[in-house]
A protein has these predicted regions:
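Long C-terminal subdomains/extensions of small-metabolite kinases
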Residues: 1-164
């Protein structure tokens, strides 16, 4: 989704290099987010919840982020009701919103007031599978993980897995 595209672009961005040189590197994310918002392709997505097999269809998906905390690493509270102790994941998504309107919705997202806006959806389940109509950029906590069409997220209750 949008955040993943921004993370991927930031890896090799001349904008980031320039802004870092003039000590304004923190603006990189904002500049690339606005630029990407108007140029990115959206995708059709099918979300399947593993606990009840409920299916959600998200049209013109801008992003879908699976989280077990209220805010992502950058501090944006995309899942304001998420809890790391309930064994559930919260899939926060934006879909079916015209790009120009999405730009004006960003402040509501940052203020955790986006859930009442049509096109923002939060789905909760211990297992979430997302299937998209075309490969989309995926990242994990800001690290680029490739372009994929299918991904499964699972909340492992009372577990902490570390990479070797």
């Amino acid at each position: 989704g949008l955040d993943a595209i921004v993370c991927k672009k930031a890896l090799h961005s001349n904008c980031k290099k320039f802004l870092n040189r003039i000590h304004l590197g923190k603006l990189t994310y904002l500049v690339l987010t606005v630029q990407s918002l108007f140029t990115m392709d959206t995708a059709e997505a099918v979300v399947e919840c593993g606990d009840n097999h409920k299916i959600y269809r998200l049209h013109k998906t801008i992003f879908a982020a699976a989280m077990n905390l209220q805010a992502e690493g950058g501090g944006v509270p995309m899942a304001p009701h998420a809890s790391c102790t309930d064994g559930m994941l919260s899939l926060s998504s934006a879909h079916g919103i015209p790009k120009a309107i999405t730009f004006f919705c960003l402040p509501f997202l940052v203020a955790a007031k986006h859930e009442k806006i049509r096109g923002f959806t939060t789905i909760e389940s211990p297992v979430i599978r997302v299937h998209t109509s075309k490969p989309v950029v995926r990242h994990a906590d800001g690290a680029y993980c490739g372009d994929v069409r299918n991904v499964e997220f699972t909340c492992l209750s009372e577990k902490l897995q570390l990479l070797k």
